[in-house]
């Protein structure tokens, strides 16, 4: 609706960090499109742990290359799985981790996942690399 579009724009204009855990649906498919990104506050951090279909990989790539997002941390992509030759793998301001569904972990596993994620976000904000890297050449 028009009211929800206005609300979305207003929230995007204020957010220093945009975090999505939205499910995949018709109403969330490519919800963050180029029009929505025209309304984001200057260089927020983007985190997507919901579904990759929230933002098309080409739109995400453009947002990161043009510093619309200062950086991003995702564990979901569009398409999934992300092809090895996709340009997103080469961006220094993007952290991609495996998507691990909730509710199926021992408490200590969940705590470790949160600890690693928090450390990686902190490292990114301080200009450091993640504590664990994916080697695509292996």
Where are these regions (language model features)?
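Rossmann-like adenosine-cofactor binding region
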Residues: 4-87
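C-terminal helix-to-coil terminal segments
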Residues: 80-138
């Amino acid at each position: 609706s028009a009211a929800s579009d206005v609300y979305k724009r207003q929230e995007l204009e204020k957010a220093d960090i945009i975090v999505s855990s939205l499910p995949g649906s018709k109403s969330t498919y490519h919800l963050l499109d180029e029009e929505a990104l025209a309304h984001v506050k200057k260089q927020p951090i983007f985190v997507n742990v919901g579904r990759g279909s929230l933002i098309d990989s080409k739109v995400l790539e453009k947002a990161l290359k043009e510093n619309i997002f200062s950086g991003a941390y995702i564990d979901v992509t569009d398409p999934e799985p992300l092809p090895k030759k996709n340009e997103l793998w080469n961006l220094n301001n993007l952290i991609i981790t495996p998507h691990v569904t909730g509710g199926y972990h021992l408490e200590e596993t969940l705590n470790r996942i949160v600890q690693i994620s928090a450390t990686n976000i902190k490292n990114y904000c301080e200009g450091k690399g993640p504590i664990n890297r994916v080697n695509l050449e292996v």
